[in-house]
Amino acid sequence: MPLFVVTYCHPDEAGWRQHVMAHVGYLKQLLGQGVLRASGPMPGEADRRAMLVIAAPDRAALDAIVAADPFAVEDLI
C-alpha cells in the first residue's frame, strides 16, 4: 500500500480550537483502521501545521480520506 505525506496548515486559530477534538477523534479512527501511520504537529511554524503519513491505494482514496477530516469539512486546512 502506498504511503502519502500530507501537510496541514491551520491559519484559523479559533476554528482549530473549536474542531480539534473532532479531528483527533477522526485520526484515532484512521489509526485503528491502519490508515494513519504517523502524525503530529510541526513546531516552530508561524501558523499551526501538522504532518500526516497516510496509507491509501491511490490519490483518489487519499483525497477522500483527507476530505472526511473534520478540519477539511469545516474548511480549516
Set out the residue ranges of the language-model regions.
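Conserved, structured core segments of small domains
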Residues: 1-77
